[in-house]
From Swiss-Prot:
This is Uncharacterized protein YmfL. InterPro entries: Phage_186_CII-like, YmfL-like. GO terms for molecular function: DNA binding. The lineage of its organism: Bacteria, Pseudomonadati, Pseudomonadota, Gammaproteobacteria, Enterobacterales. The gene is ymfL.
């Protein structure tokens, strides 16, 4: 039976990069990460070495991600599975103006994606670094669009625990018959 590279990969490179990026986002970097995890900086370095014999526990990565207020680990895991991570704020912190603002951010991000495409194909060839930049812009566009849609559904769709009519804008009532998305004015 053929060997698959992913079967023997105990700690993928994308995971190590995401952990390093998460640590770098902390104000005091590795020193702060070591404090959060109650380990030495060397313990961190040892677990992030290429071809090392130790692994960096996912639980540690999640602690550091929360401490830094980032989602680099979640993004990396989602991308490794050909998916998109969508971070959502608490619904209590979101109103119609926030949803509209997020839609404007989506449009701006799609503009950035479009500019990246134009720049990359200008010479007729998409170089590897350009492909990476395009994929980064595409990922951000998809993520922001999914975030917008999820917020719309979360606020305006009826769920078992929440009546969307309580959250709707004045003059807008979520349709009880539809269960999601349609409005009655």
């Amino acid at each position: 039976m053929g060997k698959h590279h992913w079967k023997i990969e105990k700690q993928p490179e994308w995971y190590v990069k995401a952990v390093r990026k998460t640590i770098a986002a902390l104000p005091s970097g590795y020193a702060e990460a070591a404090d959060w995890l109650d380990v030495t900086e060397n313990a961190l370095f040892n677990r992030l070495r290429a071809d090392g014999d130790q692994i960096f526990p996912l639980g540690w990565a999640m602690v550091l991600q929360r401490a830094g207020g980032t989602h680099f680990i979640a993004d990396a895991v989602a991308q490794s599975a050909n998916g998109v991570f969508v971070s959502l704020p608490d619904v209590e912190d979101v109103d119609n103006a926030d949803i509209n603002q997020r839609l404007l951010e989506v449009i701006e991000q799609i503009g950035s994606y479009s500019k990246q495409i134009r720049s990359a194909i200008e010479d007729g060839v998409v170089e590897p670094h350009e492909k990476t930049a395009i994929n980064d812009e595409l990922y951000l566009s998809i993520s922001k669009l999914q975030e917008h849609a999820a917020l719309v559904y979360k606020i305006f769709c009826i769920s078992e625990s929440n009546d969307a009519r309580e959250c709707a804008a004045p003059g807008v009532v979520a349709s009880i018959a539809s269960g999601c998305g349609e409005t009655n004015a």
